[in-house]
Curated annotation (Swiss-Prot):
Biological role stated in the UniProt entry: Catalyzes the hydrolysis of the formamide of 2-amino-5-formylamino-6-ribosylamino-4(3H)-pyrimidinone 5'-monophosphate (FAPy) to form 2,5-diamino-6-ribosylamino-4(3H)-pyrimidinone 5'-phosphate (APy).
Protein name: 2-amino-5-formylamino-6-ribosylaminopyrimidin-4(3H)-one 5'-monophosphate deformylase
Gene: arfB
Species for this entry: Methanothermobacter thermautotrophicus (strain ATCC 29096 / DSM 1053 / JCM 10044 / NBRC 100330 / Delta H) (Methanobacterium thermoautotrophicum)
Top-level class of the enzyme under EC nomenclature: hydrolase
Family annotation (NCBIfam families): ArfB_arch_rifla
Amino acid sequence: MLVELNLDAGNIISEDVHRIGILAVGSHLENHGPALPIDTDAKIASYVALEAALRTGARFLGVLYAASEFPYVKHGIHMDRDELVERELKPVLRKARRLLNLEAAVIVNGHGGNKLEDCMDDLEEELGLEIAWNNRIVEIEGPHAGSGELSAGLILGIADLRRLDECIPELYPEIGMIGLKEAREANREIDKAARICERDGVNPDPVLGQRILDDAVESVISDVKELLKIIQEF
């Protein structure tokens, strides 16, 4: 005998929001200088995804365990993009759809190397899910391991400001990707971000950190609401 669930219970925006999941994706194995942990991207994305789930009632699906990266960016351990999609992302979404009866999902990306946006249409068709790719964290946090990311980490309690004086590219070339010559030569946007970090340095700011996190959470909430409209039309 099936138990009837109280879908209208709790502080949720709609009982239909249970049909929407939120999955975080980020890198767990990537250098971020001495003041941030190697899984900074995954932790920031997980916070944003969970906070949006708490505020809307959407299902929190956790965090993907792997990430992809451009071949010329060498600051961590990553996997091929197609392998990431086929072996990691698809199985997680397929299982969530089956076990939780999902109809839609927001994927919250916290890692610039996860260039998966152009895979979403194929994923939607194959999995039978409406999918929103949310890249807001990457869009607004600025250079890799720079002021924005460090400031967000400060708010989350994962930054060690005792090591701030060590945050120089001569010791940690991944900061701003300043010392990653191959990446800067291959990618104009990476070089632009590195120049910003060279000019401005790394300066933690709790106001900036909170603004980045709040902006990212609101962006995911907006995606949840848009997906809710779509699934309610069916």
